[in-house]
Amino acid sequence: MSKITALFKELKASGKKGLIPFITAGDPDPKLTVELMHALVRGGSSVIELGVPFSDPMADGPVIQRSSERALTQGVTLHSCLDMVKEFRKKDATTPVVLMGYANPVEQMGAERFATEAKAAGVDGVLIVDYPPEECVDFAARMRVAGIDPIFLLAPTSSHERIKEAAKIASGYIYYVSMRGVTGASHLNTQDVASIIPKIREETDIPIAVGFGINDAASAKAVSVSADAVVIGSRIIRLLEDAPPGQAVQSLETFIREIRDALDS
């Protein structure tokens, strides 16, 4: 059983929901990333999504695009992201870490080498935004052989066939994108989310995490009624952008604790 699967079993047994924050590796400062990851755990995060910066993040809105640009400007690569996970693992061997990014850096490294190095670094899952499930059977199998959960996106526009394909090859959790468009959007309709999630559950018993448009404790709580976990990304990146010098770590921990408290209430 994978670390992510075990975590969701524990959450379900205790009647809790998962909290999955996203940060971009290397933003605002590569030297700060591991410290931010530990702050996420202290605040009550269940899983950490660590974004691999990319020059053309097509699914991301301006907030995460800026974040990627800042990280790339500071020389962050897929290799340095893996080094950050390795450093994080020196103090935390239990919190699942998912690498989230785009196909190009992985393909440049090669899927076989990526799987080997990611596993050695302590990565538990991988979500490649521009890998549709129907084209990734071999990639998903290679990840599972390495002990890494392949995670896939579903959206309001996903066909029944795509839902079935994702259900067949995904493990860990499925990431349901709550709305059309890019990350950072704010028009979240929780009724739409609640109506679509049961259709996904008809095809799979894999936990469903919902992201896009979750900006605060209230929206996180509302989405968690139907989802197994909530994902927060752009709001966190904005918080880090706006944090006064030297206060990013504490600001992040405080914000995550507010979300955790809301989910547990």
UniProtKB/Swiss-Prot annotation:
**Which GO terms fall under molecular function for this chain's record?**
tryptophan synthase activity
Q: Which residues are responsible for catalysis?
A: E49 (proton acceptor), D60 (proton acceptor)
Query: From which residue to which does any coiled coil extend?
Result: none
Top EC class for this record:
lyase
Record field: catalytic activity: (1S,2R)-1-C-(indol-3-yl)glycerol 3-phosphate + L-serine = D-glyceraldehyde 3-phosphate + L-tryptophan + H2O
Q: Which InterPro entries match?
A: Aldolase_TIM (IPR013785), RibuloseP-bd_barrel (IPR011060), Trp_synthase_alpha_AS (IPR018204), Trp_synthase_suA (IPR002028)
Which Pfam family, any one of them, does this sequence belong to?
Answer: Trp_syntA
Which keywords fit this entry according to its UniProt record?
A: Amino-acid biosynthesis, Aromatic amino acid biosynthesis, Lyase, Tryptophan biosynthesis
Pathway as given in its UniProt record = Amino-acid biosynthesis; L-tryptophan biosynthesis; L-tryptophan from chorismate: step 5/5
Identify the EC number(s). 4.2.1.20
GO terms under cellular component: cytosol
What is the stated purpose of this protein?
Answer: The alpha subunit is responsible for the aldol cleavage of indoleglycerol phosphate to indole and glyceraldehyde 3-phosphate.
Family membership noted in the UniProt record: Belongs to the TrpA family.
How would you summarize the oligomeric state and partners of this protein? Tetramer of two alpha and two beta chains.
Q: State the protein's name.
A: Tryptophan synthase alpha chain
| Gene coding for it | trpA
